[in-house]
Amino acid sequence: MAKLETVTLGNIGKDGKQTLVLNPRGVNPTNGVASLSQAGAVPALEKRVTVSVSQPSRNRKNYKVQVKIQNPTACTANGSCDPSVTRQAYADVTFSFTQYSTDEERAFVRTELAALLASPLLIDAIDQLNPAY
């Protein structure tokens, strides 16, 4: 079990020169969802990440790992507007593994996704909203 602690994400953004520090906000004792967010004066404007791991159940035989990212964008009209969210960007990634999967198989899927997200196909699809042809 990993301890919930500060996570620093470097080399992010379109130019790869941004850093984001996510501070632990706690783990919901009811559903086990761990929350991290960027420290900010206005909670609604904080970038957030949640991570959860669901155990297999009687009806669902697989482990489910869910990672959600929420990045709000603040109003920037010459700095004259009240702090408010003008739009949101979301990402929701779900991994599903059988109880018999190995850590090697799970690591392969995780690193495969990281490499795929860095590929020109996904960069064009996500950044430019261009479909593949």
UniProtKB/Swiss-Prot annotation:
Effect of residue 34 to S: In strain: Qbeta_3_FR
SUPFAM superfamilies assigned: RNA bacteriophage capsid protein
GO cellular component labels: T=3 icosahedral viral capsid
Subcellular location: Virion
Keyword RNA-binding: yes
Disulfide bonds: none
Pfam families: Levi_coat
UniProt keyword annotation of Methyltransferase present: no
Molecular function per GO: RNA binding; structural molecule activity; translation repressor activity
Signal peptide interval: none
Effect of substituting residue 96 to L: Decreased RNA-binding to the viral operator and loss of repressor activity
Result after altering residue 64 to E: Decreased RNA-binding to the viral operator and loss of repressor activity
Site positions per UniProt: RNA-binding: 90
Keywords, ordered alphabetically: Capsid protein, RNA-binding, T=3 icosahedral capsid protein, Translation regulation, Virion
Domain of life assignment: Viruses
Functional description taken from the UniProt entry: Capsid protein self-assembles to form an icosahedral capsid with a T=3 symmetry, about 26 nm in diameter, and consisting of 89 capsid proteins dimers (178 capsid proteins). Involved in viral genome encapsidation through the interaction between a capsid protein dimer and the multiple packaging signals present in the RNA genome. Binding of the capsid proteins to the viral RNA induces a conformational change required for efficient T=3 shell formation. The capsid also contains 1 copy of the A2 maturation protein. Acts as a translational repressor of viral replicase synthesis late in infection. This latter function is the result of capsid protein interaction with an RNA hairpin which contains the replicase ribosome-binding site.
Assembly information from the UniProt record: Homodimer. The homodimers binds to the viral RNA via an operator hairpin, but also to many other RNA sequences in the viral genome; this interaction probably shifts the virus from the replicative to the assembly phase and ensures specific encapsidation of the viral genome. Interacts with the maturation protein A2.
Protein family (similarity comment): Belongs to the Leviviricetes capsid protein family.
Protein name, per record: Capsid protein
Source organism of this protein record: Escherichia virus Qbeta
Lineage per the UniProt record: Viruses, Riboviria, Orthornavirae, Lenarviricota, Leviviricetes
